[in-house]
Amino acid sequence: MRPAAIAALVLAVAVAVGWREARSPTASAAPVAHVRPTAGRPAIVQRPIPFGAKRRAEMRAYARRHYGIDDFHLRTPKVIVEHYTVTDTFQAAYATFANDVPDVELHELPGTCAHFIVDKDGTIYQLVSLTIMCRHTVGLNWTAFGIEQVGRTAREILNRPAQYAAVVRLTSWLRCRYGIALRNVIGHNESLSSPYHRENVASLRRQTHGDWTHTEMTPVRARLGRYRCAG
């Protein structure tokens, strides 16, 4: 067989083999990169609680007593604290925070509050400006956003897909917007282990609550880790 004919035959065989491999269901394909979702701003309903001059003055006095900070502004947010309301409705939790009365536990002013409440159906309500301190976690109010979730246990919230997803979206957006490390997204029960915990009142230095333990927060932080910050 002439060299030209041999070359043509080899080329034909190579093309045929390549065509069969391309059609083969077992042919290797380039791996598809998994793209993590971006932590964009979720839909937020504005339902501000009264936070006028009187309450701001009370918050300023509270910050002086507990943190040595003569200010009511939240200037350096480094922590996000997750809570649950121990109520069955948004309205009940909202009423508690809107009433600027001494809390039943520590009997201090201003009244307790949180920056957000996430309802059972996943609706996100903002109650307080992100530039103002709220009383939600002893030792961390000076540097923490508070997110309350309507419910009585962490298990309830983890088992409500819409509410759980909304909590993750809101927390991811806040975390990315303010450059808050994932390790600093904590449950209220984890407050004493935060490197940002500070408390000038000696009797309150070990004070915390039972909501959102380390075990309960573990799947939440894992899910938050799936989101990437834009930019």
Ranges and model annotations:
Residues 19-56, 153-231:
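Basic/polar, cationic surfaces and motifs that engage anionic cell-wall
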Residues 2-7, 11-137:
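N-terminal catalytic cores of peptidoglycan-degrading enzymes
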Residues 80, 138-147:
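Short coil-to-beta-strand
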